[in-house]
Amino acid sequence: MSTWANLGLQDSASPLMEQLIFFHDHALLILVMITVLVGYLMFMLFFNSYVNRFLLHGQLIEMIWTILPAIILLFIAMPSLRLLYLLDEINEPSITLKSIGHQWYWSYEYSDFNNIEFDSYMIPTNELSNDGFRLLDVDNRIVLPMNSQIRILVTAADVIHSWTVPALGVKVDGTPGRLNQTNFFINRPGLFYGQCSEICGANHSFMPIVIESVPVNYFIKWISNSVNS
């Protein structure tokens, strides 16, 4: 869930999200250092009355302010590229989940099992239980095993949607006629909430996503009950 006053990122539930948070903190530290340096130089220029009447050019300072930003950009670009490749890497999945975006709900199919598919609608506010979350709870949750490599295939039936779960560091566009995929690894049990992150019409904000992460033995029981029912 979001933190107080929407400050900061959600607690990570996957190794990829942990890496994203580390990169965010790394880049933010560099930006703070740049801001402090530029602010200090501006302050000194405003309150320094000394001038050099004979200064026509300064090759040394020009080299410094050309090379230094390039080095700083390298310190940002290298971790960013590393993380970009990590996010695109597809490992051998244990389970494949297919998600289809509609106006304005999600459909899910467990491709590795027969006849396990369902639609997931937002629960209206007047039907919520006392411990429910407004605009975030759904009637049918996605149930996935923790500590397993999961592949998700995302597409759409009408307009462009985007399947997004911040705690997992996952955001995949669902485009009609196209199949996009990514993978993630949930490292703890719990409920993880997401929403459609692409404007898709009047009820765009009413397309929540809820993942219930459970131990593998509970997931197997859930699959067995779903197949038998």
Curated annotation (Swiss-Prot):
Positions contributing to Cu cation A1 binding: H161, C196, C200, M207
Residue ranges annotated as Mitochondrial intermembrane topological domain: 1-26, 83-229
Keywords: Copper, Electron transport, Magnesium, Membrane, Metal-binding, Mitochondrion, Mitochondrion inner membrane, Respiratory chain, Translocase, Transmembrane, Transmembrane helix, Transport
Binding site residues for Cu cation A2: C196, E198, C200, H204
EC number(s) on file: 7.1.1.9
Superkingdom: Eukaryota
Cofactor binding, note field: Binds a dinuclear copper A center per subunit.
InterPro entries: CcO_II, CcO_II-like_C, CcO_II_C, Copper_CuA, Cupredoxin, Cyt_c_oxidase_su2, Cyt_c_oxidase_su2_TM_dom, Cyt_c_oxidase_su2_TM_sf
Record field: transmembrane: 27-48, 63-82
Subcellular location: Mitochondrion inner membrane
Pfam families: COX2, COX2_TM
Binding site residues for Mg(2+): E198
Sequence similarity: Belongs to the cytochrome c oxidase subunit 2 family.
Protein name per its UniProtKB record: Cytochrome c oxidase subunit 2
Organism of derivation: Drosophila ambigua (Fruit fly)
